[in-house]
Each structure stands twice: as structure tokens, then as C-alpha cells.
Amino acid sequence: MEKDSCREVNMKIGFGSDHAAIELKSVLFEHLKSKGYECVDFGAYSPDQKVDYPIAGRKVAEAIRRGDIDKGVLVCGTGVGISLAANKVPGIRAGVCSDCFTAKMVKEHNHCQIIAMGQRVVGTELAKMIVDNFFEAEELGGRHANRVDMITQIERDYGYADAPIK
């Protein structure tokens, strides 16, 4: 992918939420789409359609693992439950963020492919700034890459030999 002012052009981003967080997911979907990202919605699609956060988190994480999308944005009430589900998919790193600094760090230091947040925790404008910070940040190498390798080794130690995902 080409780099364009610290972001990847043609990046494909998957979005997922439970039924309680559709509003914020939709706002973030349109926000990043307006910036030129290719956006894919994995649901929930209606507040009347009950979708549990583990289902949404898993869908987006598995799509990254398969290579169907590059990164993900997940939203539930707090961001915690949906990120826990995504993190169960081997090779996936999802970080919960409720501020811009953390959003930058989970990308630079932890090489997270997914950012998660809570509709009950962050407002719309802050959420936009959070995703902007995440997608404008770049993964750092050196000691940070070594630490991510240590996390991958934990997965391997527990039988996930195919855990590495870049």
C-alpha cells in the first residue's frame, strides 16, 4: 500500500458493533469513508437486530486474519467486551481506546490491527479524533516490534503455531 501523509491509501477497514453501538459505528464508518478509506460494515445493521458483541468482534478479527480487510474498528458499550472477543482470534491485537494518546500508542507500540471503543464512554467528536490518531500512526520497529514478537510467542506456546499476522 502506498503511504500518503502518514496513512495508507487503499486501506480496507472493517467495522463491527453490537446492537447498542450502531450509532457510533455508523458515524465512524462515514467519517473514515469521507477520508478515502474503503470501509466494510460487518454489522450490526439495526438497533432492532440483537447482535452480541462477541459475534461482531469475531467477524472483524477473522476478516483481518483471512486478509479480507487490513484493519478494524469495533464498538460496543465500553469497547472492552468486543475487544476481548477479537483478541481470542490468533494473531489479532485489539486495543481499547478512550483517548487520542492511547490510540496512537496501540498502533505504534503494540501494532494493533483493531481499535475498539465504547459508545457509552466516548462522544462522537472524540471518537473521530481517536480513530484519526490510530490510522495516522505508524507501527514502530525496534524494541516495540520485539515486544509484539513476544506476544506472538505466547500464542505459539499455547499451540497457535500460525499466529503471526502482520
Predicted regions and their residues:
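Short, structured coil segments at secondary-structure junctions
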Residues: K35, V89-P90, N110
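Glycine-rich phosphate/diphosphate-binding loop of Rossmann-like nucleotide-binding domains
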Residues: F15-S34
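A short beta-strand-loop structural module common to alpha/beta enzyme folds
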Residues: E38-Q49
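C-terminal binding/interaction regions
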Residues: K12-G16, A20-A21, C100-K166
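Short, Lys/Arg-enriched N-terminal segments with co-localized hydrophobic residues
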Residues: M1-N10
